[in-house]
Amino acid sequence: MWYTSTRGMAPRVNFEGALFSGYAPDGGLYMPEELPRLDEETLRHWSTLSYRSLVKELCALFIGLELIPRHDLNDLIDRAFSRFRHRNVVHLCKLKNGLNILELWHGVTYAFKDLSLSCTAQFLQYFLEKKKKHVTIVVGTSGDTGSAAIESVQGSKNVDIIVLLPKGHCSKIQELQMTTVLKENVHVFEVEGNSDELDEPIKAVFADVAFVQRHNVMSLNSINWSRVLVQMAHHFFAYFQCTPSLDTHPLPTVEVVVPTGAGGNLAAGCIAQKMGLPICLVVAVNRNDIIHRTVQKGDFSLCEVLRTTLASAMDIQVPYNMERIFWLLSGSDSQTTRALMEQFERTQSLQLPKDLHNKLSEAVTSESVTDEAITQTMARCWEENQYLLCPHSATAVNYHYQQTDSGQSSIRCCLASASAVKFPEAVQAAGLTPETPAEILALEHKETRCIPMRRGDDWTQMLRVTIEGLSQRWKDCVVNPSE
């Protein structure tokens, strides 16, 4: 399996090359050159598999056996999921009036990012141990990615991780999950800006291809193909858990409602759709509605300001995985994708070509949800089911309530991206009582460590200097291993 850049100006790479990259050298994102097409017989067989086994089957399609033999791949995935709190890793909760919620948050940090990051970290370690290499991971977070990435690699001798978090834009618990990890290989920066602003120095660093290669810099954000690959399993498992029968022809369709920020989970769903999974995708966003406007009107343009919402991990104006979706739906047209993304980067405004917009609106429907609707949905779900939603998952459930209230009776699965325990402020805003586990309460009493990135500082230079220092430290350790 080979991977190509969405912008078509970079050499193709294998899975290992895509794994150890951030952006491709031409600024694009890696995608498989060809997608396997799954027939109904394969889907029927996969429908009998556990989530864990489904991840193994999907990864085996996209990772060459010459890179990771199948028995090694199975072991890595088992190891990745060994610390999840639920024995099935993920869990489908069936509630009243056809409300199906796929709980993706049973990992260590209570967010769906644990699923893909735990696997990706295992793949990384596999290659690093073989080659005795060191990498520096750079991650920008709007809340959940940072803690899940830290958890997946903390304490690793041949990995350093740098996380940039947006000061005042995460929940207190999200922030503490990052700043209380004091391992020597974890380096957290608190940025005086929002999640889109902190992405700028990261993209600037990755634009210097020679620097990235010299210091072995990579990303664990969902620009990393491995993240998207594992997230495809969410959609397959949601379909198999919710469809009443796979004995009919054609196979029945299931709506999958995806709370969305940077669009990695949405891109994974679009790829699954292209592979033959009969799902209808619904993207649920908060008031930062660029994806909603793109689906509805073809308007892929920034608003003047980023809005702060209760669904803070989705407070994103630049959903970079839309580039993957544009490439996919344009028939792998890298020339068109490159022109579109370069225009967007230059002007922060883009009107999709009519044919591409038509294909997008056929593949995906969308909704934008206010904070008021989020809290109303959280309150209603508790009243009807005694079930606490996180504010992000509530954007998906809000769509379900809208459809059922208007008499629409499709089979539907709402993806629950995080546990409500991470967002007590939003739970209280909905008039409900937070449920906080002891391990979360204990965060308040732990020592914290982070480095400020203030407005007026040169954030890109700070990042470069940190990377250079970590790279030099590794070289010193190799030369003087006893020190």
UniProtKB/Swiss-Prot annotation:
It is an enzyme of class 4 (lyase). This is Threonine synthase-like 2. The lineage of its organism: Eukaryota, Metazoa, Chordata, Craniata, Vertebrata. Its EC number is 4.2.3.-. GO terms for molecular function: lyase activity; phosphatase activity; pyridoxal phosphate binding; serine binding. The modification N6-(pyridoxal phosphate)lysine is found at residue 113. It comes from Mus musculus (Mouse). Belongs to the threonine synthase family. Acts as a catabolic phospho-lyase on both gamma- and beta-phosphorylated substrates. Degrades O-phospho-threonine (PThr) to alpha-ketobutyrate, ammonia and phosphate. Also degrades O-phospho-homoserine (PHS), but this is not its physiological substrate. Its cofactor is pyridoxal 5'-phosphate.
